[in-house]
């Protein structure tokens, strides 16, 4: 984390979780004037048993009081609906699998929230992300966290130079275990609070039940690649490539005992295509194309580019060659076949520890 002048005001996005809480503590103990910001991105019934917003706000208030910083509650639900949620609905309707966290970081946390922090007099916005920022001759680089298991650079790959220049990741150099230990030592009520998982606006409720509230499901056939109908699906928007659960086609007398997996979606015919066996060759691909390209540095890399890539956040880095097709499309050729490459997800590129940027898988 860079050293700033001691009289600078830094706003911290306090989510009620342990990571942002320790991030605020680190800044406070370094002598900065710290203010907390709690985002409300989703309008929900206070009686909704699946929404943790009320508890999260309560935790954020308790932590702010504990550290001794003010906390402001800001509502970005309209911006979130317009710039994140509606985009996700459009993607689901087209049979793709979007990543809302990526869009939320670019459009809400490091845009709407950053702008609000500036209006309050803050010079920078800090969050509890596990990533690092390096200033190299006034060009900002996004680097992986020291904790490889918790690294979140994948979700931050759409950030631009302005956003990085005005952001701070105080715990990017910490291990998760260190963060929890600090929180416990300081008596934070959330030191053992579990990490949030799943899609943020769905919470712990069933994905299918939630989507049904916003999109009209169209049941259809489940077929093998050869066109044999072996079942019915509830709507292809509920499934993603590589998925095993929820197909309800096990125990067929004309097939072996190996489980079935989604391998593709035929949106035009409203057909879900499945194959049998985890290692089925159709689940693997050695190449992809991507669009909506974004490069973090002002100057994009030279092509063809030999680098590493991830097609999902927890995946190990995979060697590949990236070739520019046109202004907004790249071809990615992997050294080894990749399992369950999914349209709508992000492919993110790395050189060593640096996140270069990425695109959306076609």
Swiss-Prot record:
Encoding gene per record: mnmA
Broadest EC class assigned to this enzyme: transferase
Organism of origin: Coxiella burnetii (strain Dugway 5J108-111)
NCBIfam families: PRK00143.1, trmU
Any one biological process term the GO annotation gives: tRNA wobble position uridine thiolation
Localisation per UniProt entry: Cytoplasm
Spans annotated as Interaction with target base in tRNA: 99-101
Name of this chain's protein: tRNA-specific 2-thiouridylase MnmA
HAMAP family: tRNA_thiouridyl_MnmA
Region entry Interaction with tRNA, spans: 150-152
Pfam families, per database record: tRNA_Me_trans, tRNA_Me_trans_C, tRNA_Me_trans_M
Catalyzed reactions: S-sulfanyl-L-cysteinyl-[protein] + uridine(34) in tRNA + AH2 + ATP = 2-thiouridine(34) in tRNA + L-cysteinyl-[protein] + A + AMP + diphosphate + H(+)
UniProt keyword Manganese, yes or no: no
Binding positions for ATP per the UniProt entry: 13-20, 39, 128
């Amino acid at each position: 984390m860079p050293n700033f002048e001691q009289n600078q005001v830094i706003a911290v996005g306090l989510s009620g979780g342990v990571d942002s809480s320790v991030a605020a503590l680190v800044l406070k103990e370094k002598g900065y004037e710290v203010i907390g910001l709690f985002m409300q991105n989703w309008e929900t019934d206070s009686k909704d048993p699946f929404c943790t917003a009320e508890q999260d706000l309560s935790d954020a208030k308790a932590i702010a009081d504990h550290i001794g910083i003010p906390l402001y509650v800001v509502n970005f639900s309209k911006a979130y609906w317009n710039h994140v949620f509606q985009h996700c609905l459009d993607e689901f309707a087209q049979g793709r699998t979007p990543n809302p966290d990526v869009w939320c970081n670019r459009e809400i946390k490091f845009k709407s929230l950053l702008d609000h922090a500036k209006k309050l007099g803050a010079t920078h916005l800090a969050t509890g992300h596990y990533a690092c920022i390096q200033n190299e001759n006034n060009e900002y680089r996004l680097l992986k966290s020291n904790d490889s298991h918790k690294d979140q650079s994948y979700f931050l790959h759409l950030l631009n130079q302005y956003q990085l220049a005005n952001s701070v990741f105080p715990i990017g150099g910490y291990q998760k275990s260190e963060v929890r230990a600090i929180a416990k030592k300081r008596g934070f009520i959330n030191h053992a609070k579990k990490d949030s998982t799943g899609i943020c606006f769905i919470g712990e409720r069933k994905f299918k039940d939630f989507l049904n509230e916003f999109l009209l499901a169209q049941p259809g056939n489940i077929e093998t690649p050869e066109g044999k109908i072996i079942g019915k699906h509830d709507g292809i928007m509920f499934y993603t490539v590589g998925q095993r659960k929820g197909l309800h086609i096990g125990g067929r007398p004309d097939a072996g005992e190996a489980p079935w997996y989604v391998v593709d979606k035929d949106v035009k015919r409203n057909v879900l295509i499945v194959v049998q066996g985890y290692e089925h060759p159709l689940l693997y691909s050695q190449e992809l194309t991507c669009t909506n390209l974004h490069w973090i540095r002002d100057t994009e890399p030279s092509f063809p580019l030999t680098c590493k890539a991830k097609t999902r956040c927890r995946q190990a880095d995979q060697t590949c060659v990236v070739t520019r097709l046109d202004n907004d499309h790249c071809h990615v050729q992997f050294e080894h076949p990749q399992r369950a490459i999914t349209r709508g997800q992000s492919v993110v590129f790395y050189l060593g520890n640096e996140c270069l940027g990425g695109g959306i898988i076609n």
